[in-house]
């Protein structure tokens, strides 16, 4: 179940989108769905592609590129894992956005509460205006959809 009201905070130019979902699977399974690239691509927005820089890893210092697959442009976010411990992965990114994407698996009685916190700013004022005008609400909706897809992927792993 998704948290009833997604949190959206705008502090100066920094914005925070935070959402959570309850998943009926252990935190280790949920974490595996985030950390393993093949499983990640089962729930990631189909318009996004995550490419490793070097070997794929979610260890601190590991780098990757998130590419938005739109015709002609393919904007890219360069990301680095900056925090990592069991149940937690935090990517820091730069590109048209600058910020952090936090994925935290919190064990609960019947599974896991997965928290996704996207803290960012858009440095370019023209791109910021376009994002806030046209894409901010869609981004939050997509985050909710990704959490629902991740829930399905994680819960399906239990049947294997």
Question: Where on the chain are the PLM-derived regions?
Answer:
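Hydrophobic ligand-binding cavity/cleft-lining segments
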Residues: 2-59, 160
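A conserved amphipathic terminal alpha-helix motif
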Residues: 12, 120-160
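Hydrophobic-ligand binding "helix-grip"
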Residues: 41, 67-115, 119-121, 152, ...
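Short alpha-helix boundary/capping motifs
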Residues: 57-59, 68, 142-144
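Short acidic/glycine-enriched loop/turn segments that link adjacent beta-strands
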Residues: 58-60, 98-99
């Amino acid at each position: 179940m998704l948290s009833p009201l997604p949190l959206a905070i705008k502090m100066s130019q920094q914005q925070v989108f935070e959402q959570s979902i309850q998943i009926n699977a252990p935190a280790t399974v949920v974490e595996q769905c985030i950390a393993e690239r093949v499983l990640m691509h089962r729930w990631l927005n189909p318009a996004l592609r995550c490419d490793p820089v070097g070997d794929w890893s979610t260890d601190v210092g590991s780098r990757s590129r998130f590419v938005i697959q739109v015709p002609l442009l393919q904007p890219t976010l360069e990301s680095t894992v900056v925090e990592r411990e069991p149940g937690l992965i935090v990517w820091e990114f730069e590109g048209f956005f600058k910020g952090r994407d936090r994925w935290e698996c919190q064990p609960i009685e019947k599974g896991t509460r997965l928290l996704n916190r996207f803290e960012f700013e858009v440095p370019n004022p023209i791109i910021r205006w376009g994002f806030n005008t046209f894409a901010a609400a869609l981004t939050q909706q997509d985050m909710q959809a990704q959490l629902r897809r991740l829930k399905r992927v994680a819960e399906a792993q239990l049947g294997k």
